């Protein structure tokens, strides 16, 4: 069983690298299940639209996770209630529309995969306690009982919080990855009890930028230049960044984790 997890898709350049590469990668690596974080996929890098989500599904994505930008496009409020494959962080207010986790079949209907979307509490917009939410979900998505495999996308700023969640799910989830900071970390590994982990899997976007945004305009904003405009995504060649987890069908835990970085400035 192979699961592909890709980092935040950033604006048009990020969508383009997905469109040009995802189907080929799924075939090349014999991927069974694909999860991407789509919360920056809109043209301005903030939020996601119905049409973009549906493009991702047609390109082979099984589940789209998100984070603090999930509500930036108003149309998504209605759509997320209708489309169970689009997740918002589970620890948003209880009354929030949509779901923060779900159970999905692989394309061949052979396996059930649990996908959990969480958002950090530190330096992020106010949410419910992420560990309390995680505790409740652990009682609902149980490896080798109601799912064959499970993965967690933890959308957060702080390395320590991400690492703590990784250890909290160690042995009870196939993999835990961090998103949000848009730069892939070098700590790709399998934890003590068998859970694949990486603090941040980066972004699918133009790295010749400031975390995906146009670098010239970003510098103007840092320098308080009156000519600076609102942030907008960089438009150069994008890098596709994520990981592939190879999992044991008997235990549901990770056997191997491989970093996947292709295209754009990170590979040149």
Regions of interest found by a model, annotated:
Residues 1-268:
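Acidic, metal/ion-coordinating pockets
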